[in-house]
Amino acid sequence: METLILALLATPLVFSLVMAFLPKNTSYNVFAGLNLVSVAAVLVLSIMAAGDVLMSGDTASALGLWFHLDSLGAIFVLLIGFIGFLTGLFSLPYVKADIEEGSMPAERAKQYFALFSLFVFTMLLACLSNNMILTWAAVEATTLSTVFLVGIYKNKTALEASWKYAMVCTAGVAFGLFGTLLIYANAADVIPNAHEAAFLSCVLPYADQFDPTLMRLAFAFIVIGFGTKAGLFPMHTWLPDAHSQAPSPVSALLSGVLLKSAMLVIMRFYGFTIQAVGAEYPQLLLLIVGTLSILVAALSMFRQDDLKRRFAYSSVENVGVIALCLGIGGPLGIAAALLHCVFHGFTKTLAFCVSGNIQHAFGTRSLAKIQGVVEVAPATAALAILALLGLGAFPPFGMFISEFLTFVAGVTAGPMWLVVVVALGLTVAISALARIALKSVFGHAPQGMGKHEAPALMLIPEIILAVMILWFGIATPLPLVHGVETATGIVLEQSTEELHATPMYRAVFGTETAQSEVE
C-alpha cells in the first residue's frame, strides 16, 4: 500500500515535469496524450489505494508518518481521481477548440496540460499529507498551480481574475497557517513525543488535553484561512471571477474538487476542536458561516448574467451547505456533509463542462445572448437539464439524498427557524437555476444560427458524469456509504451506531448497514 500511495503522488508530478521540459513547439497531441495518461494513471491508482481503504475501513501510511490514508481521505482521493480523469478527457477537444478559435495560442497547450497535472498533484498532496504544516503548504500550492490556469487566456478580465485569486487566497490561507501553528504549539506541549506534534494521526488522541482558549482561536483562524480556499462567505470574493475566467475543465476541477479538498482540512481540525472544547463552539461558527454563504450566494445568483458566474455562486451556496452540515453536527450531519462533497463535486463538474459546450456553440457566456440551446445543440441541452436538475437537488439525483439528510439532521438537532431560513435560501438558488433552463435552454435560438453540437469526445465524459449523478441517487454504491460511515466516525472519534439508528438514514440506505453488506 505504501508503494501505491507514493506512486499516486508521484505520477501527476512526474508527468507535469516531463511536459514542462518539452519544447514549446512539441505537437499538441503529445501534451494532450501525456496529460491523459497522467490522469488515467491517477484514476487507476486512486481506485486501487483509496478503494481498498473504503472497502476495508483500514488505514495506510507511507514514508513513516508523512502520508496517511484513511476512509475520510480516501473519499476525497477518489473524487480527485474520477473528476481529474473526466475533466482531463474533456480538456482534449476543449483546448483544441480554443486553439482553433484563436482564444488560446497553440504554444500555450504546454502550459495548460503541465499545470493541469500539477494541480491534480497538489490536491492529492493536501488530502494524503499527515503533517499539518505540509497540508497547509499543499493547499497554498494549489493556488500557485492554478493561478496561471485561471489567467491562461491572458485577456484583461482573465488576468484580473487570476491576480485577485492569488492575492485573496494567499492572504486568506495565511490565517490558516497561523491557526495550524497554534495547534502545533498546543500539541507540542501535550503529546509525549514533541517531534510528532505536527502529525495529525499522532496529535488526535491527545486533542482533549489541548488548551481550550487556544483551540477556539486556532479554529477561528482555520475556518477563515481554509474557508477562503473553500469559497465560504465572506472570503468567497475570488471564486466567481476565477471560475468564470478559467477554461471550463479548470472551473470544473476548482469547484468539483479544490473547494472540497479545503473542506477536508477544515473537517480534520473540526475533529480536533470538538475533542478540545466540545461541539458547541465549532458548530456555532460553522452554522453562521454556512447559513450566510447559502443566503448571500443564492441572492447573488440572480444578478449574474454570466453563465459560469451563476454556477460559481451556486458553488458558494453548496459549500455553505457542507459547512451547515458540520455546524448541525452529530453523525447524521457529518455523513450528510461528506455525501454532499461527493454528489456536488460530480454534479458541478457536469455543469461547468456543459457550460463549456454552450460557450463554444454561442461564442459567449452571457445568458441574455444564450437562447435555444435545445435547437442549437440538443445533446448539450439534455445534459444541461440533467445538470440543472441535479444542482436543484431534485430526485432521483444524488444531491437530493445529501440535502434531504441535511434537513433531517437540521430538524432533529437544530432550531426550526434556521431550517426554514436555509430552505428559503435553497429555494431562491433553485429559482436562479430554473431561469437558465427556461430562458436559455428552452428559448428560441437567434435567427440564422445553425446546429453547433459539441464533438463526441466532449460529450462522452459529460454523459458519464450524468449517469453517475443519477446512479448516486438511485442506488448509492455501498462502498461509498460504508466509507462515509467510517469517515464520520473518524471526524467525531466515536461509533456511528447513532447513524444506523436514525430512521431516515435507514430509509435511504436500507435497514442493513453498508458495512455488513460490503462484508
Question: PLM features: what roles do these ranges have?
Answer:
Residues 1-7, 14-114, 489-490, 512:
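Transmembrane helix-loop-helix hairpins at membrane boundaries of multipass inner-membrane proteins
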Residues 1-5, 28-34, 63-73, 105-113, ...:
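Membrane-interface helix-boundary signature
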Residues 27-39, 160-172, 377-381, 456-464:
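Alpha-helical transmembrane segments and their helix-start/interface "positive-inside/aromatic belt" motifs
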Residues 43-53, 177-185, 394, 472, ...:
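C-terminal TM-helix exit segments that contain a strictly Trp-centered aromatic cap at the helix terminus
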Residues 86-96, 120-133, 145-439:
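Hydrophobic transmembrane alpha-helices and their helix-loop junctions in integral membrane proteins
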Residues 110-113, 253-260, 458-462:
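Select subsegments of transmembrane alpha-helices in polytopic membrane proteins
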Residues 140:
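Short phosphate-coordinating micro-motif centered on Lys-Gly-acidic
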Residues 189, 193-197, 246, 377-379, ...:
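Cytoplasmic/organellar membrane-interface segments at the starts of transmembrane helices
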